[in-house]
Amino acid sequence: MIMHIISMEVLHLAVKLAVIYYSSYGTNYQLAKKAAEAGEQLGAEVRLLKVKETAPQSVVESVPAWKAHAEATAHIPEATPDDIVWADAIIFSTPTRFGVATSQMRAFIDTLGPIWAKGHTVNKVVSAMTSAQNPHGGQEATILSLYTTMYHWGAIVVTP
């Protein structure tokens, strides 16, 4: 009887989903927001998080759409390594820049070495999304490079 109760409780635990994105103008924010909403609709406990902006403030402010997006999403918390440890599943969303993830996303991923070394990335269920302003902009290469990192983590990659 106790085992039945425990297994029933386990079945009702919400999946902890971190949706981590970088977006200059808002496209990947919209993708991430939709993924977070879908997770919530399915009963997941969701954290919608952005990675730290590393472009100089003067550059961000010199591009009206970039500045407007930064201001509109100022309320979104920045992702930390602790969010990766917390999550059961992670969806990354980043623009494609010349066939690779943005430097902002890579900078965040590069901070995760200490939690990887402790085994905190093993068996995380992960996926990724990307966008580019042009056809054949390197989206596939971006996703594959992100997945290479995640394979190295020991994560379980779920492709679209």
Model-derived segments and spans:
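N-terminal beta1-alpha1-beta2 submodule of the flavodoxin-like/Rossmannoid cofactor-binding fold
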Residues: 3-4, 8-117
